[in-house]
Amino acid sequence: MKRKILIIADNCDVTKSVAKNIAAVFGAAPFANWSAAVVSAKDFPPTKLLSANAFLLGCEKPEPPEFTDIKVLFTHINLVGRPCGVFSPQANAIKYLSGLVRDSEAVLGNPLVVTKGAVDSRKLKKWVGGIIGGKA
């Protein structure tokens, strides 16, 4: 059975694009035993998080309106030991996302600072490997 990673992003073009690029690295070596699902933070069903073995969060700016419910959820849910990563084009958004998951006790990996345009798949594989384990 494949392990699941959930990628939650705001509606910004940059973060949506990066989320899709991240999802594309799953299903093939070295992450062939993983499947990825990308969901909009706006339409995020909290039950999806419970079935995920790991999760990633991305937004362009701190406190986007789409993350209001997620912020509440993460103050009440226990995700102790679950691998987590955050990505954004802005350092202050990474700080926001990192703080968001703190109370959940998820294991936060190194953040990914993204720029406009495509992100190199080798860089994404290395980043993901650092979060969920595995070499890329």
Which residues does each predicted region cover?
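FMN-binding flavodoxin-like domain, especially the glycine-rich phosphate-binding loop
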Residues: 2-8, 21-41, 46-136
